[in-house]
Structure formats: C-alpha cells, structure tokens
Amino acid sequence: MTKTNFSLTARQREDIMKVYGEIALTCHSQQEAYIKVASHPAPRYYVSPKQAFERLRRMVVGDFSEVDAMTEPRRRMYYSLFEKLKKVSQRKEFIGQSLHFICQFLVSEPAPEFFLSPVSVQYIFNKCKRYGKDFRDNK
C-alpha cells in the first residue's frame, strides 16, 4: 500500500469514526448505526486521482467492463464519479481540460455515501477502537 493510499485510508477511518459518533446517539443498535454510517454522505471520494483516472478514462469511451466486475459498493462509487464527471466537465472552468486534471478535483468533491457495506463499517469501527486509525490490514 502506498503512502498516499494509506493517508486516504486513515482519513476515511477518521471520517467514519466521526460520523459514527454523531449517528450512534440516535440509533437503537450498533447494526443500525453501521447501516446509517455506510449510507451517510462522505466529505470526499476515498480514491486517489490516479485510480479514478484509470477507471473513468475507460468509462468515458464506453468500456464499463472493468467497473462492472467490481464489488457492489466500489461499482456504485465509480458510477457516481462518472455521473459527477459529466456534470463537472460542463462547468466553465473545466471545459477543455484533460480528464487527468479534472480527476484531481473530482475525488475531493463530497460523496453521496461512504461506498462501504455495513459489514466493512463494522470491521473498520472495531479495528479503530482496538488499534487506532493507523492499523494496517494483513490481507
């Protein structure tokens, strides 16, 4: 895992824990909290501009095969980025700019959700509580 990707992962974990703290007070169970956190709006897309560029450049020319083979949350994330790309590329300041340039701004836009399953949120929550947000997966 590269340093850049890990900083995104740590930031995502921080944001998940923050949202969990806000949402857990109104939930009747932890499972309900995990579900609500997973569908809660996120402050950004947790993907690097390079990764977004690699997937979106194929989608722009009509090749959705790589994205369609992904897990459901990841697929939703890239389709959401693609829809946002269509809107953002029509803005005056982005007309005529390269996809690579646009992706740098696109991934920092607010995301409609965290694009994680409730099980993943639970895993992250438990690991963060036990080891802190900087734990490394041994997968």
Model-identified regions with their sequence ranges:
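Basic, amphipathic alpha-helix used for nucleic-acid engagement in HTH/winged-helix/SANT-Myb modules
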Residues: 1-24, 30, 35-95, 135-139
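Acidic, proline/glycine-rich low-complexity IDRs
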Residues: 121-139
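Short, basic interhelical loop/turn and adjoining N-cap
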Residues: 38-55, 104-127
